[in-house]
């Protein structure tokens, strides 16, 4: 079994995913064969791994930081929320059904075998495995049968480092409180802590570090400052979208309705990085900005439910007004399905609504079918004759007259649809804006000159900068010696 260290948080969104990605790059730069692992993830931001299954995009990014192909075994259990009470269950990359509330709690102990099998496969040939927990180990109401945090750590005998987020406040209480509430067996697994997202003079927190150690007996591995490189990396949790604020007006405003079950929102990251583009996330209850040149309907885990939510917010009427003003629309995956005349779900795959009228902006119809398409693809944009690399994760088959004007060609078949005037576009492909030449041509067609950024290189540079920041702020030797 490979050496391993597990990073657990005092809560969600404390920065574990990016921290592990940065430490993966640190270990790689030190010449170690390092691999990422997350026993259980809950996210609709999924990736298609290099071996052809679904994993969290955070683990895909961590694999990139390690310089290795991504694998379904890096995230053996993935939960994709599709209703308020249930999630689609993905085990080792493949759909296993729906997990609902208490039923999933009863199912978790059975999943430990798959988790441990994947952990062994990830560790095979590795010098170090960096493990990421989920949520917080302090949620002791979920401790029985746990596979995500201390349940895994105790089962696999992996030492734990706790991560506290000082930016949200109360970090001393959150760490000391976690120490207090953990059962003795779990507390014994914790070897220390680190503080994340500090702004200002770190020396001002010296007394805080001493207080945490005094109350817990845990050693400090350091304080990570607020690192600008993090903003250039894909975010895993949609909570980060809720904090977006409008900046100075740019040449092109791209409006994105924040659908309740938004998925794969990192499709937007390359656009956000363009200096002439402002991506505006529009929360429920707010209107689409009238000055938007492009509206993107993003992917969603539940197309029909989110189409209903779109209508409840009045965004359907605003979208029609946007088109009448000469605006453009791009639908991606579930957003593409919404643009059509009708969505049918006779088997009730998505829920109780069997048939619903679409937005009618494209002359297409979608039939939901049980078979799920999960694959990485190489394609050619038929709008601009430029190569694309992306991935598909969807159910449903779409057809109709506007499919005669496809968005892209994948091998021997076409993808997507374009309206006769070219202003309404839809595709099943995620990741299209990561292709620099396509992105620049796409923006130019909207009257905006794209920058010279190479998006993939910018992600690699951000990982290197993150690693440098962690080397400078943490006791890396002490951390890696835990394994």
From Swiss-Prot:
The record places domain GATase cobBQ-type at 251-438
Q: Which domain of life is it from?
A: Bacteria
**Is this entry keyworded Manganese?**
no
Recite the lineage of the species: Bacteria, Pseudomonadati, Pseudomonadota, Alphaproteobacteria, Hyphomicrobiales
| Protein encoded by which gene | cobQ
The name under which this protein is listed is Cobyric acid synthase
Q: SUPFAM superfamilies attached here? A: Class I glutamine amidotransferase-like (SSF52317), P-loop containing nucleoside triphosphate hydrolases (SSF52540)
Q: Which family does it belong to?
A: Belongs to the CobB/CobQ family. CobQ subfamily.
Mention any Pfam family matching this sequence: GATase_3
PROSITE patterns named in the record: GATASE_COBBQ
Which pathway does the database say it acts in? Cofactor biosynthesis; adenosylcobalamin biosynthesis
Keywords on record? Cobalamin biosynthesis, Glutamine amidotransferase
- Output the Gene Ontology terms for molecular function: ABC-type vitamin B12 transporter activity; catalytic activity
Locate the active site: 333 (nucleophile), 430
| Purpose | Catalyzes amidations at positions B, D, E, and G on adenosylcobyrinic A,C-diamide. NH(2) groups are provided by glutamine, and one molecule of ATP is hydrogenolyzed for each amidation.
Biological processes, Gene Ontology terms: cobalamin biosynthetic process
Q: What species was this sequence derived from?
A: Brucella canis (strain ATCC 23365 / NCTC 10854 / RM-666)
């Amino acid at each position: 079994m490979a050496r391993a260290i597990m990073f657990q948080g005092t809560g969600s969104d404390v920065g574990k995913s990016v921290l592990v990605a940065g430490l993966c790059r640190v270990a790689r730069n030190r010449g170690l064969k390092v691999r990422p692992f997350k026993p259980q993830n809950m996210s609709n931001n999924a990736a298609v791994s290099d071996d052809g299954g679904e994993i969290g995009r955070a683990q895909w990014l961590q694999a990139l930081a390690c310089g290795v192909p991504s694998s379904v075994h890096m995230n053996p259990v993935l939960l994709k929320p599709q209703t308020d009470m249930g999630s689609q269950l993905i085990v080792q990359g493949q759909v296993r059904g729906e997990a609902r509330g208490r039923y999933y709690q009863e199912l978790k102990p059975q999943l430990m075998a798959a988790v441990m099998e994947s952990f062994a496969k990830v560790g095979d040939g590795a010098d170090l495995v960096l493990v990421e927990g989920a949520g917080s180990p302090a949620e002791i109401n979920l401790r029985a049968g746990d596979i995500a945090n201390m349940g895994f750590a105790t089962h696999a005998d992996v030492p734990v480092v706790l991560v506290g987020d000082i930016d949200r406040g109360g970090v001393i209480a959150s760490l000391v409180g976690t120490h207090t509430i953990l059962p003795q067996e779990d507390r014994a697994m914790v070897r220390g802590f680190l503080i994340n997202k500090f702004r200002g003079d770190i020396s001002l927190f010296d007394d805080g570090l001493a207080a945490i150690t005094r109350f817990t007996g845990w050693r400090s591995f350091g304080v990570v400052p607020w690192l600008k490189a993090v903003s250039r990396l894909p975010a895993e949790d949609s909570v980060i979208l809720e904090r977006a604020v409008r900046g100075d007006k740019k040449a092109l405003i791209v409006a994105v309705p924040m659908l309740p079950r938004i998925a794969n929102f990192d499709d937007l990251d390359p656009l956000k990085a363009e200096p002439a583009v402002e991506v505006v996330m529009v929360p429920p209850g707010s209107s689409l900005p009238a000055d938007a040149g492009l509206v993107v309907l993003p992917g969603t885990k539940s197309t029909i439910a989110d189409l209903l939510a779109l209508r409840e917010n009045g965004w359907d009427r605003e979208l029609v007004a946007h088109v009448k003003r000469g605006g453009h629309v791009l639908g991606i995956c579930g957003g593409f399905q919404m643009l059509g005349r009708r969505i049918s779900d006779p088997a009730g795959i998505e829920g109780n609504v069997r048939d619903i009228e679409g937005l009618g902006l494209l002359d297409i119809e979608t039939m939901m079918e049980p078979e799920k398409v999960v694959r990485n693809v190489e394609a050619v944009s038929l709008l601009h004759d430029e190569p694309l690399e992306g991935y598909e994760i969807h159910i449903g088959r779409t057809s109709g007259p506007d499919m005669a004007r496809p968005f892209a060609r994948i091998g021997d078949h076409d993808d997507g649809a374009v309206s006769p005037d070219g202003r309404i576009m839809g595709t099943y492909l995620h990741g299209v804006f990561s292709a620099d030449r396509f992105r620049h041509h796409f923006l130019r067609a909207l009257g905006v000159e794209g920058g010279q950024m190479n998006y993939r290189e910018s992600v690699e540079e951000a990982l290197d900068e993150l690693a440098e920041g962690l080397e400078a702020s943490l006791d890396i030797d002490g951390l890696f010696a835990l394994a």
